[in-house]
Amino acid sequence: MNACHFSGWIPFAPETRYTPSGRKIICFAARVCDERGAESILRFQMDGDPVAPLPPELAPGRAVEIEAAATTQAVHRPDGRTVSRLVFHVTRLAASGRRQRRPGDSPLQLALF
């Protein structure tokens, strides 16, 4: 695993999934910016307490600092091809205030996990 650090903001609400064994997985996205100023949306996963509410740091519009471990995962497609996907597992999540909306930003964004 490779350790990564990201600064960004949460563009839309997270999604909660449960494994067959009952483990809670929180899937969320963050819009991050690289050193050249280019923005990307990255998807993250983190373990959650099965009975606890979602962390307030994951509220849409919240600025966050994320430390994650990156792993490569094989994905088998319906057409028979196997491709690799980079998966980020969160090791630390910290809020850093609210993001200031820029002119031209859409107030609604859709997440597909």
Question: Which residue ranges define each predicted feature?
Answer:
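Single-stranded nucleic acid-binding surfaces, predominantly the OB-fold ssDNA-binding core
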Residues: 1-113
